[in-house]
Amino acid sequence: MIKKYYESDADLAAVQGKQIAVIGYGSQGRGQALNLRDSGLSVIIGLRPGRSFQQASEDGFEVFPVADAVKKADIIQILLPDESQGAVYKTEIRPYLADKKCLMFSHGFNIHYGQIVPPPNVDVVMVAPKGPGHMVRRTFEEGKGVPALIAIEQDYTGDAQAIALGYAKGIGATRAVVFETTFREETETDLFGEQAVLCGGVTSLIKAGFETLVDAGYAPEMAYLEVLHEMKLIVDMIYEGGFTNMRDSISNTALYGDLTRGPRVIGEDSRIAMEEILEEIQNGEFAREWMLENIVNRPVFTALKRNDEEHLLEEVGAEIRGLMPQFKKNA
């Protein structure tokens, strides 16, 4: 069974008196930094010039160039995009990693795939909230927390686990639960979840359902409402109580269709495709492909993203959301 930690298992003392540098100030960086500060910890921000620099300053943080922040810090939490971390680490972090510093991540991609290879005389840990930065912040302000993962890749000082748990407590994660994992397990399961289910799987399923109805002559608006708009209602019920809760809340007609037709949509061919996707993650093929895509300025990424943004589904969705007061700001 996976090991779990709660408030009583973590001690802020492990990170008190240490200078924490959060490198990056996007959604996750901002949420974590604000929570850490509100927990009484010393936090500075390391950034390259840009809009985030102004935001961090307005939030009351001392903001430094990345290299200067690393020099000042005992704990360096790297919260930059995966594709940017390697280059920034090489030029602005690695030269200033002094003995016994702690290098921290919220995703294992760069460590697991060797884009970042830390020296042996530092701790290397992960604290990965299982929610976006704004949720990390909001739940903290409500006196609750978002669950998180911790992993220890390198324990040079002997204090790596205590530091990871102390940091997790500082962002509010131990108010919920903290699970212990490894960099490998977190990276591979996270990528698989994104690609096969949460992002790639869901969007492809919705798009295929929408196109099937429209191609059969049904109004695009009806297709949108049936395959996308109602998705949140179903997902919320699953989130709150699993499949059983959702199935107890729908009609018997819907449930019979679920049980008898669902496996025809996601059947053996889909399972085979999922296994292939997982293998590409495990053997590093996906990581190499994504790194190469960035080296050549993302031509495939840009084209595919543009195609989906111009899809009829997006046009109809914007129109329908514009008719609903609660969605107008997102239309």
UniProtKB/Swiss-Prot annotation:
Gene3D superfamilies: 6.10.240.10, NAD(P)-binding Rossmann-like Domain (3.40.50.720). Transmembrane segments: none annotated. The active site is at H107. It comes from the Archaea. Mg(2+) 2 binds at D190, E226, E230. One of its GO terms (molecular function) is ketol-acid reductoisomerase activity. Residues 182-327 form the KARI C-terminal knotted domain. Its cofactor is Mg(2+). Its EC number is 1.1.1.86. It catalyses: (2R)-2,3-dihydroxy-3-methylbutanoate + NADP(+) = (2S)-2-acetolactate + NADPH + H(+); (2R,3R)-2,3-dihydroxy-3-methylpentanoate + NADP(+) = (S)-2-ethyl-2-hydroxy-3-oxobutanoate + NADPH + H(+). It holds the Pfam family KARI_N. NADP(+) binds at Y25, G26, S27, Q28, R48, S52, D82, E83, S84, Q85, G133. Binds 2 magnesium ions per subunit. One of its GO terms (biological process) is isoleucine biosynthetic process. Pathway: Amino-acid biosynthesis; L-isoleucine biosynthesis; L-isoleucine from 2-oxobutanoate: step 2/4; Amino-acid biosynthesis; L-valine biosynthesis; L-valine from pyruvate: step 2/4. Substrate binds at S251. Residues 2-181 form the KARI N-terminal Rossmann domain. Keywords: Amino-acid biosynthesis, Branched-chain amino acid biosynthesis, Magnesium, Metal-binding, NADP, Oxidoreductase. Mg(2+) 1 binds at D190, E194. Involved in the biosynthesis of branched-chain amino acids (BCAA). Catalyzes an alkyl-migration followed by a ketol-acid reduction of (S)-2-acetolactate (S2AL) to yield (R)-2,3-dihydroxy-isovalerate. In the isomerase reaction, S2AL is rearranged via a Mg-dependent methyl migration to produce 3-hydroxy-3-methyl-2-ketobutyrate (HMKB). In the reductase reaction, this 2-ketoacid undergoes a metal-dependent reduction by NADPH to yield (R)-2,3-dihydroxy-isovalerate. PANTHER family: KETOL-ACID REDUCTOISOMERASE, MITOCHONDRIAL (PTHR21371:SF1). Belongs to the ketol-acid reductoisomerase family. This is Ketol-acid reductoisomerase (NADP(+)). It comes from Methanosphaerula palustris (strain ATCC BAA-1556 / DSM 19958 / E1-9c). The gene is ilvC.
